[in-house]
């Protein structure tokens, strides 16, 4: 719906189009919004490259479909979301967390709701576990100085995310004197609530030289990278308004 609305309002939407320095130079935008998001953190664990090891992004996007007995590595917000999702799909889920509790990054009210959901779904939580290796059919860790093993058909990496490298995009924007603004996870991986507010504010103030430090230009040609993502859509919506 957002894409159709943007097209009706005259936005030039280019799908399946990699962002290059040449493309930015061709468009000659007033401002470039970098909304290319984040990529999952993959820790350097022995066995991480095996076929039955997938990451949280691919699971939640439907690109990977674990089944059977699943071990989720990482018991933070994203890891618990993966646990709930897979439990609903009929998987038997065990989550491994290094800290003393799962969901330590959740607010108290939300944590209560999530923990209740995990309990009702039969998700097994194992805390204070440091994962050492992923072997065929099992995840090997260390707990209280002892080796522990968790059998699995699939292992899911859910450690967290890091911003994608946008240095080329920034350099291309600076080269032609365009403004450059990072929004959402492209600036720093964090929660959607904060990132959406940031995208809203950036779209409302992008041509204010006192805020963004470059001179406003009369022609408002804007380039938004990663426009199919949540942050890109929020920015586009407010630019068009």
PLM feature spans:
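N-terminal Rossmann-like dinucleotide/flavin-binding domain of flavoprotein oxidoreductases
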Residues: 1-29, 104-129, 137, 149
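Short hydrophobic alpha-helical segments of the AMP-binding
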Residues: 6, 86, 239
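Rossmann-like dinucleotide/flavin-binding elements
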Residues: 14-28, 35-52, 56-106, 142-154, ...
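Short, hydrophobic beta-strand segments that form beta-sheet elements in well-ordered domains
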Residues: 32-35, 241
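N-terminal Rossmann NAD(P)H-binding glycine-rich loop of SDR-like oxidoreductase domains
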Residues: 220-240
């Amino acid at each position: 719906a957002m894409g159709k609305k943007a097209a009706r309002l005259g936005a030039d939407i280019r799908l399946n189009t990699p962002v290059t320095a040449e493309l930015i130079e061709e468009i000659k935008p007033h401002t470039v919004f970098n909304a290319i998001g984040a990529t999952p953190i993959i820790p350097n664990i022995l066995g991480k490259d095996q076929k039955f090891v997938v990451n949280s992004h691919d699971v939640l996007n439907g690109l990977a479909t674990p089944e059977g007995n699943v071990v989720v590595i990482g018991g933070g917000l994203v890891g618990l979301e993966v646990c709930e999702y897979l439990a609903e799909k009929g998987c038997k889920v065990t989550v491994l967390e290094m800290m003393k509790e799962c969901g330590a990054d959740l607010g108290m009210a939300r944590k209560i709701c999530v923990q209740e959901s995990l309990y009702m779904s039969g998700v097994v939580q194992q805390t204070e576990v440091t994962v050492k290796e992923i072997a065929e059919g099992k995840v090997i860790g260390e707990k209280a100085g002892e080796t522990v093993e968790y059998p699995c058909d699939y292992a899911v990496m859910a450690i967290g995310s890091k911003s994608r490298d946008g240095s080329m995009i920034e350099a291309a924007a600076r080269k032609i004197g365009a403004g450059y603004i990072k929004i959402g996870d492209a600036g720093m991986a964090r929660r959607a609530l904060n990132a959406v507010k940031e995208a809203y504010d950036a779209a409302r103030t992008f041509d204010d030289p006192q805020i963004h430090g470059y001179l406003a230009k009369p022609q408002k040609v804007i380039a938004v990278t990663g426009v199919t993502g949540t942050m890109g859509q929020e920015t586009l919506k407010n630019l068009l308004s």
